[in-house]
Amino acid sequence: NEGLDSFVFGTGRLLDDLIQYVYSGENCRLILMGDVAQLPPVMQTESPALNPEILRGYNLQVQEITLTQVVRQSENSGILFNATRLRDALRNETVEIFPKLKLKGFTDFRKVNGDELIEEISSAYSRDGIEETMIISRSNKRATLYNNGIRNRILYREEELSSGDRLMIAKNNYFWTADNKEMDFIANGEIIQVLRVRRTYELYGFRFADVSVRFQDYDLEMDVKILLDTLQTDAPALPKELNDKLFYTILEDYDDVPTKAGKMKKMKADPHYNVLQVKFAY
């Protein structure tokens, strides 16, 4: 419920704002859907929006329904078997001892040694394609290591950013789609592909690139500005202290603007402040 960014919408308490907005209307109802086994918001141990007791604290009448029947996986799936074992451990609060994964007896779940990993990923790319292959890691730091390893040892890309690179949007952005009727905004988690790197440069103590990209889910091309610094950070996006630095450094360009409102209007129209934050998406 607490906003962690320096500059947030509303009060910075998302659940409070959502409930206040919905129930300010007449005869409104709110349905919250989610998975209690997924990660909660950053720096929290549970998801407030999925906790009936927290919701009742807003003086709401709460009904809770849990779906348990799996319908889109094979009953013999090793992925489903082990995921269910983890889910049961979470529900029974026995996660202090991590459940041992069952490896044998499945065709879709197996152990790969470290010295086989590069070859396995390369084979998956050749067999199924990069877009159909996803590597999941336990931390942002390891994700950065995997991304760099894949680019260097499988795709043989030595440049900081190359045509063909797959990127994931790391923060919602409303600036670059303002004049586009097909997209309202660029969402966190959106996958894009670099078509052309027109130029890279340094400004305000940060590194930027002007690129042409294709949006995988929209078959749409767009010219955008991206922040190269986020590609190698061990955080999901630009850390707060660097966000603050970028904001206040750019703000100095508008010292001649007399009012705070005028300064903020300039900032909202500044392409460097509204730069796309991205991570490699391998």
Where are these regions (language model features)?
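SF2 helicase catalytic motif II
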Residues: 1-19, 29-32
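Short, charge-rich amphipathic segments
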Residues: 15, 56, 254-257
